[in-house]
């Protein structure tokens, strides 16, 4: 029963996650906790990370066929994203995350509003033009910066890097929303794999739960990538805005609970 439930839920999660460039952990972790399938939140995180690896692989295959992945920019993002993830996790030992979670959540609320507006990056007037080359493509140095910020946020707050990477690439660097989604999903593969392996050796990864999630998310990711060719870019921005709004409210709520 639980196998089938997680499998079909993962198809839906993978479908949405692949369309907006996130791993899907923001949905899988609360699902596993709600179903009482795990004893701790860390076990839910570790198990969901294993599925996220397969979301990245499946999405990368689909988006590479569409030629939507900016590999040059991704290679600038990836190393600093890994460094940032380590740095973020390291900082949790010294800095209370509750107050910062509230502040970061408020920032995400603002960004979600920008995405929900559905406007083109140029219409928002927030493009960092000095960070673009003569052809309008983002410079690698900005890719490294985006990767670092996304990595630190992921390591410190336990959120997916796509929550930072997609809006940063689309709103501030003018990268096409589908390209931003595809590149984000490609980048999160290696970092999710490292995190999943770490959780496995810590005993936080349940193979029996990760298997149906992975199988479902592989299918969902293919459906999500296919769907991006059937919907408007305004719809994609607004869909991401909804996902981001959910993440922001969830982060603020957890921060408030920690403070109180």
Across the structure, where does each feature detected by a protein language model lie?
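Hydrophobic, membrane-facing alpha-helical anchors
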Residues: 1-6, 49-61, 134-135, 159-168
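Transmembrane helix boundary and interhelical junction motifs in multipass membrane proteins
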Residues: 20-31, 158-168
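Membrane-embedded alpha-helical segments of transport systems
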Residues: 50-58, 83-84, 187-194
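Small-residue hotspots at the loop-to-helix junctions and early N-terminal turns
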Residues: 41-45, 181, 185
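Juxtamembrane transmembrane-helix boundary motif
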Residues: 1-16, 29, 33-41, 61-153, ...
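Conserved N-terminal glycine/acidic-rich loop preference
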Residues: 6-13, 17-22, 27, 49-56
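Alpha-helical transmembrane segments of polytopic integral membrane proteins
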Residues: 25, 29, 54-57, 109, ...
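Short hydrophobic/aromatic, small-residue-rich stretches within specific transmembrane helices
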Residues: 48-52, 184-188, 209-214
